């Protein structure tokens, strides 16, 4: 066994020991587990290119969501423009058939960028947590892209799932309730991603297992960050609203879905 293989084995074993305690709050938060029928479809090797492609796009969309929250609610113009510049090369590649950039170089550039500024304490928390989330999601984006390249899986544009749109349909339309609801939706999307990584990992080869389990800690923290921000900005307890979106999310996961995606529902027959 090479040094690299020993390190991977050690890392993987540590992850396997730690991930149940990371996952437990996520499972308690979600209203249902991933249906077995989805896992059966997801573990089919023929579906791996589609699964990885949708996972890639989900990472970018998670970064976009965080960016939009910062831009709309707290960022000064220069800070907002800086954040926009972070995502533009990724968006051009993923959505507009632009050239594939050097994602490693882009990530290093992002790490050195100036942060948006605000004097509002809650706004400062939003910036700090969302900027970290953006960096992590973009890092995951190019990690998934590396996995695809290593397996000779080309990037092909695909349609979006119904999942996020289904969640956002339930968002109230006046502030600050809109913001609160969007933050709660963000929490559920991150929590479901975490749960699906864990549900799928045992059925994948060791490299993909290690990769997916390595994402659990950050995804679990992201859902908690979203929830904390929602409660902090709300003048009232948000528990009822959290339960409501839990029911919306569970219905999307448990109902038949004709399109297989990373966050799709029960595979529909026919």
From Swiss-Prot:
Cofactor annotation comment: Contains a nonheme dinuclear iron cluster. Contains three different forms of the dinuclear site: an hydroxo-bridged FeIII-OH-FeIII center, an oxo-bridged FeIII-O-FeIII center and an hydroxo-bridged FeII-OH-FeIII mixed-valent center.
The reply to whether Cell membrane figures as a keyword in the UniProt entry is no
Residues that bind Fe cation 1, according to the entry?
59, 137, 140
- InterPro entries in the record, alphabetically? Ferritin-like, Ferritin-like_SF, tRNA-Hydrxlase_MiaE
Any idea what a deletion of this gene does?
Disruption mutant shows normal growth characteristics after being shifted from anaerobic to aerobic conditions. Mutant shows slower growth on citrate and acetate, and is unable to grow on the citric acid cycle intermediates succinate, fumarate and malate.
Q: Name one Pfam family in it.
A: MiaE
User: Which residues does the annotation say bind Fe cation 2?
Assistant: 137, 190, 219, 222
A GO molecular function annotation here is:
monooxygenase activity
Give the highest taxon in the source lineage.
Bacteria
> Which Gene3D superfamilies does the record match to this protein?
1.20.1260.10
EC numbers listed for it are 1.14.99.69
Q: Which cofactor does it need?
A: Fe cation
Keywords assigned by UniProt, alphabetized: Iron, Metal-binding, Monooxygenase, Oxidoreductase, tRNA processing
Q: Which CDD domains match?
A: MiaE
Q: What is known of its domains?
A: Binding of tRNA to MiaE induces a protein conformational change that influences the electronic structure of the diiron site.
Similarity comment: Belongs to the MiaE family.
Q: How does it assemble?
A: Monomer.
Name this protein carries in UniProt: tRNA 2-(methylsulfanyl)-N(6)-isopentenyladenosine(37) hydroxylase
